[in-house]
Amino acid sequence: MSYQNLTKHTPYLYYFCTIQNVISILEFGILSRNKAIDLGVFKKDYDWSNRQIQLYRKNTSIALSSGKESSVHDLVCTFFSPFNTTIYKAQEILNIKGGEYSESSIVIAINIEKLLTNRDKAYAFSDRNVGASAENVNYYNSLSDIDKLDWAVINQTYKKFDNYYDSAFKEWRDKKSSEFLIENIIEPKYFAQLLCISEDTKAFIQKNTQISVEVIKNLALY
């Protein structure tokens, strides 16, 4: 099975959401941005993303494993590790907006083997964050290319730098946030576990799902 090319590096994909969105995700699944808007479940008030970056992603098309070309906004964007700078940036934005990120942040772990055993799932992946400079990002749609990603960087936990503005950090940051993209939806049946930072968040989630919930304190940036 081609999914084994990926599971030798990580058994899970990871998706960041907030406590305000998790109930609808447990009901409908993780939806692409466009599909969430079409179904009327996109909550603009809880959207932490950068508007300019989202415009760039909307206008970025990627060739999928099915042969189809899709806008990033028609894809569910996941990561290979829960420790990546995009998730940390989301926590920082939540904190600035006045929300308590340790209570709001949730990471969904997605079972790769179950997901990719479904041959109807079209996908692609990148060797850097999709929001990085276009000339630096390579896209792939065959798992035979998965070893082209920098797994030493991807599988590191968070790393401190002396200078967070130089090219060394930016290169590490973009590789750390390489993405795996699935067309339209990841259904709840593929969710393996929900990760959160606080016991209160765990208690809230457990009232709404039978999926395993684990508290991991070092998911927090601060």
What are these regions (language model features)?
Residues M1-C77, N84-Y222:
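Active-site-proximal loop/hinge segments that shape catalytic or ion-binding/gating pockets
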